[in-house]
Amino acid sequence: MTANVTPFPFPPDRAAADPQAAAQPDPLGDLVGDPLGDPLAALAGGGVIALITGVEGPHYRSPGTFMAFPAQGGSVGQLSSGCIEADLAIHAAQVAHDSRTRRLRYGAGSPFIDLVLPCGGGLDVALTPVGPAPIARALAARAARQDFTLGIDLDSGAVVPGGPGFQLRLKPATRFMVWGAGVEAVRFAALASAAGYPAQLTTHDEATADAARAQGLSPLRDAAPAKDAAPLDADPWTAVTLFYHDHDREPPVLARALASPAFYVGAQGSLRSHRARVQALREMGVADADIARLRGPIGLIPSARDPQVLAVSVLAEILSEAER
């Protein structure tokens, strides 16, 4: 959905000079930005949501990206690389003051000729007030790792879970369940965690567990489950990766992973190792349809041997799959 353009009456460089605008208190307080923060959590107490509703040509962000101007002040998130955030703050203050949605156009086709997008594209942004109630439901769904949609009426400004209007889908974050032993397992789990993703390493090896703790991880002990153990507690937004040098430990874990709805299941090793684990899974009675989901060799870089390169290669492959 592409938003229509409703220019704000005060260009950002002249708003402060308008007596009426200057007389209005700034309900958002000191607009100090936190571009790396959590915009959804920032709106727990209500505020203004700034949402990309349309993109023309090249741009860094896609429709559905949003940032927050919390009621208590400041801003969280970013819609550009700093090109429009100061201007959005001015519009957000007005939205908070009069509780009216504003729809803006930046870049190509915009009335704001002094705000240029270096990428050369056009960007439609809607700013609308939002109360704590729908955000509380969204946060609860995220905590439960449930898919959730907020319907945002770009005309009335109504924000209703599952309602009509622009559909803001809030998917659970990609989660990583990592099993294995050795530096490859630790490197991968640490990289995923450092990138901001939930990552849990499970290992039978105490040296691996110690190395993981040194990286700030909290590894779990591998109890070597039987082949008939319950499926892993993985949801459709979970990736399961195995980094074992002792491939005999893989089949029971892989059988449990393939019985779950995890969107990605893969194991480190050569093509020969992959064929051996496929045969082992067949002998365990795992269905061919489930085995077909197993990735191997894993990673975008063929035959990566350096642990750090392997970690980056596998992480990139998984995130590419998650975006599909």
Task: Cite the ranges covered by each PLM segment.
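Beta-loop-alpha module in the N-terminal Rossmann-like domain of NAD(P)-dependent dehydrogenases
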Residues: 247-251
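A short acidic, often aromatic-flanked loop/helix-cap motif at beta-alpha or helix-coil junctions
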Residues: 133, 225-229, 299-305
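Glycine- and other small-residue-rich loops at beta-strand/loop junctions that grip anionic moieties
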Residues: 77, 81, 242-243, 266, ...
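Adenosine-phosphate binding glycine-rich loop
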Residues: 263, 268-324
